């Protein structure tokens, strides 16, 4: 018989740097999960993606065991990295803060493809372009 799911926790953590300190500690500690075990497994699974923010969905079961699924980094993080920015525009429609090329958009779309609700690379590129525009990043050819 399948284990009963008690909770699903969504976090965004830096790859390879999960520690029992907040936000991991409070989110998982109150559900009785062994924090050090989670941190070791997460850090091992994301060691090759150092420096990136990785969304993770942790499923906690009744017997205090857990499983987790890592996703691709958020599009906003990848766009900021491509445009060499620290943050997006405070006024996205009026003030552009950076530029990315269509080739960079295509690279990001290929990375994000498995997490996006898109059937082909063109649709994924349009989604990423929309994210860029909402951050005040201009898309150039």
Curated annotation (Swiss-Prot):
It holds the Pfam family Ribosomal_L11_N. One or more lysine residues are methylated. Keywords: Methylation, Ribonucleoprotein, Ribosomal protein, RNA-binding, rRNA-binding. SUPFAM superfamilies: Ribosomal L11/L12e N-terminal domain, Ribosomal protein L11, C-terminal domain. GO terms for biological process: translation. One of its GO terms (molecular function) is structural constituent of ribosome. PROSITE patterns: RIBOSOMAL_L11. It comes from the Bacteria. InterPro entries: Ribosomal_uL11 (IPR000911), Ribosomal_uL11_bac-typ (IPR006519), Ribosomal_uL11_C (IPR020783), Ribosomal_uL11_C_sf (IPR036769), Ribosomal_uL11_CS (IPR020785), Ribosomal_uL11_N (IPR020784), Ribosomal_uL11_N_sf (IPR036796). One of its GO terms (cellular component) is cytosolic large ribosomal subunit. Belongs to the universal ribosomal protein uL11 family. HAMAP family: Ribosomal_uL11. Forms part of the ribosomal stalk which helps the ribosome interact with GTP-bound translation factors. Part of the ribosomal stalk of the 50S ribosomal subunit. Interacts with L10 and the large rRNA to form the base of the stalk. L10 forms an elongated spine to which L12 dimers bind in a sequential fashion forming a multimeric L10(L12)X complex. This is Large ribosomal subunit protein uL11. It comes from Thermosipho africanus (strain TCF52B). The gene is rplK.
């Amino acid at each position: 018989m399948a284990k009963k799911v008690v909770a699903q926790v969504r976090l965004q953590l830096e790859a390879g740097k999960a520690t029992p300190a907040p936000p991991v500690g409070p989110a998982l500690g109150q559900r009785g999960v062994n924090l050090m075990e989670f941190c070791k497994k997460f850090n091992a699974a994301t060691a090759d993606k150092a420096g990136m923010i990785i969304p993770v969905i942790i499923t906690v079961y009744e017997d205090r065991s857990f499983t987790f699924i890592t996703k691709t980094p958020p599009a906003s993080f990848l766009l900021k990295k491509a445009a060499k920015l620290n943050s997006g525009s405070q006024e996205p429609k009026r003030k552009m803060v950076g530029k990315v090329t269509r080739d960079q958009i295509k690279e990001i779309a290929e990375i994000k493809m498995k997490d996006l609700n898109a059937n082909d690379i063109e649709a994924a590129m349009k989604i990423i372009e929309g994210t860029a525009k909402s951050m005040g990043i201009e898309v150039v050819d």
